[in-house]
Design a protein with these regions (language model features):
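Hydrophobic packing and interface segments
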Residues: 1-215
């Protein structure tokens, strides 16, 4: 659980760092590695989800702190003493993330990639015209062509990365359901917990795990 706390904290800090760098980036090529970084962060989050799910299902009967303090803190913050309310609040957060943010970002990436590819021939012709008119040197023209190609590659990569992130959001919903349903079955059938205790423990852990992952 201590390692989970460390990795989840690192994951949150990494997300904040990526956000700050993205905000202060004015040109796509200034942060051309963003699609790769996004994929790496998503894979890291999925790995943490698998590790936390294992602990939730195997040790969730011991209490809400079974998977570490970070998951417990996020879970108790959302649930606020009523785990039924917590489930609905978390469902709203998932809908916002999946339907609004993820779907919107995917659409923006798709449209940006399409328009960038459509504009490439015109940009290439403009560079050739400037080169023939003597407004550009051959080195400057070559650099501009390379920038156009890199920009097209960037938007194409972002289009693919956005679909990967959408799949990750759907996986987060399925993992939440597995944690809650599987946890209740294990807690009641194997550890003889009362239904209310099992529901409280596993819902706090599942919601906390899901919220940390969604962030």
């Amino acid at each position: 659980s201590i390692l989970l706390d460390v990795f989840f904290t690192t994951n949150i800090l990494l997300s904040l760092l990526i956000l700050m760098v993205s905000i202060h980036t004015f040109r796509p090529l200034d942060f051309s590695s963003f699609p790769t970084v996004l994929l790496f962060a998503t894979i890291l989050r999925l790995g943490l989800n698998v590790a936390s799910t294992r602990i939730v299902l195997s040790a969730g009967h011991t209490g809400p702190d079974a998977a570490g303090k970070v998951i417990e803190a996020f879970g108790e913050f959302v649930i606020a003493g009523n785990y039924v309310v917590g489930i609905f609040v978390f469902a709203i957060l998932i809908i916002i993330n999946l339907v609004v943010i993820t779907k919107g970002a995917g659409r923006v990436s798709e449209v940006s990639a399409r328009f960038t590819l459509d504009a490439m021939p015109g940009k290439q012709m403009a560079i050739d015209a400037d080169l023939n008119a003597g407004l550009l040197t051959s080195e400057e023209a070559k650099k501009r062509r390379d920038d156009i190609a890199k920009e097209a590659d960037f938007y194409g990569s972002m289009d693919g990365a956005s679909k990967f992130v959408k799949g990750d959001a759907i996986a987060g919903i399925l993992i939440l359901l597995i944690n809650i349903i599987g946890g209740l079955i294990i807690g009641i059938a194997q550890h003889d917990l009362p239904v209310s205790t099992a529901a409280e423990n596993y819902i706090i852990l599942s919601v906390g795990d899901g919220l940390v992952a969604q962030i």
